[in-house]
């Protein structure tokens, strides 16, 4: 009986300490997309006399985030954001001496959930690493017409999953919230899009080339978390219990 009591207390003590430490904070974020050669960001397509290349050359993401601190070193984070990938593409026909360059945007929405681990660097400075998954949503296809051609990006799925990893540092002020700087890697499990680039000859006969885009990207993350006073929340809970 005594052994069972000790085991029960050992299980309840960590749970109670977790419950006391839970703090939820809300934040906003802006994430410029960084072109990176090693992320399969460029695709080359070709057929007889027609060549094309599509390359991720930037973009940005923005949205809101919610962080739930379970302990002083562990937290969960989720949110909702929009991502605009900007691609540049070229279309060439060597027999017609034709060359064209243009840009096209591909818009998506993301619902991530990650687990974070914090390492204290100073009195108010922390480093964190995060790993998790994201549900990615694509509302429509994208296209861009040029003088003698067209690029059309077909969404392969309206929703799919991806893996995300994050590394950053943050500074927690006394009453002015938390300022965060970091980087995020996002890679869908499946190809983002099937892309058709078409050259139209003098008789408007189409000469298409086709490929797929991985959709992987890297961002520089700028975030701000609004101030949340844990002591104030505890006082509110205590007051409710008394009432």
What do these predicted regions represent?
Residues 1-4, 20:
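Positively charged n-region of N-terminal signal peptides that target proteins for export
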Residues 7-9, 28, 105:
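Residue-level detector of alpha-helical transmembrane segments in integral membrane proteins
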Residues 19-65, 223-233, 243:
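Short glycine/proline- and aromatic-enriched beta-strand/turn motifs that initiate or cap beta-hairpins
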Residues 30, 34-36, 67-144, 173-175, ...:
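Gram-negative (and chloroplast) outer-membrane scaffold detector with strong preference
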Residues 36-57, 84-108, 136-160, 191-200, ...:
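Extracellular/periplasm-exposed beta-strand and loop segments of Gram-negative cell-envelope proteins
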């Amino acid at each position: 009986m005594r052994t069972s009591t000790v085991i029960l207390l050992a299980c309840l003590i960590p749970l109670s300490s977790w419950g006391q430490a839970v703090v939820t904070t809300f934040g906003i974020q802006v994430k410029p997309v960084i072109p990176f050669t090693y992320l399969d960001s460029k695709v080359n397509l070709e057929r007889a006399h027609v060549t094309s290349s599509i390359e991720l050359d930037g973009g940005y993401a923005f949205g809101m985030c919610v962080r739930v601190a379970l302990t002083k070193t562990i937290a969960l984070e989720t949110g909702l954001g929009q991502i605009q990938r900007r691609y540049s593409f070229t279309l060439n026909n060597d027999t017609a001496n034709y060359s064209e360059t243009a840009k096209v945007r591909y818009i998506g929405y993301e619902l991530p959930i990650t687990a974070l681990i914090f390492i204290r660097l100073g009195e108010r400075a922390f480093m964190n690493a995060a790993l998790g998954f994201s549900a990615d949503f694509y509302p429509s296809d994208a296209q861009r017409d040029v003088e003698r051609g067209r690029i059309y990006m077909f969404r392969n799925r309206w929703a799919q999953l991806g893996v995300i990893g994050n590394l950053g540092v943050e500074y927690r002020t006394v009453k002015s919230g938390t300022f965060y700087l970091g980087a995020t890697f996002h890679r869908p499990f499946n190809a983002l899009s099937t892309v058709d680039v078409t050259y139209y000859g003098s008789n408007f006969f189409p000469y298409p080339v086709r490929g797929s885009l991985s959709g992987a990207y890297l961002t520089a993350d700028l975030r701000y978390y609004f101030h949340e006073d844990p002591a104030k929340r505890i006082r509110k809970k205590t007051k409710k219990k008394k009432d």
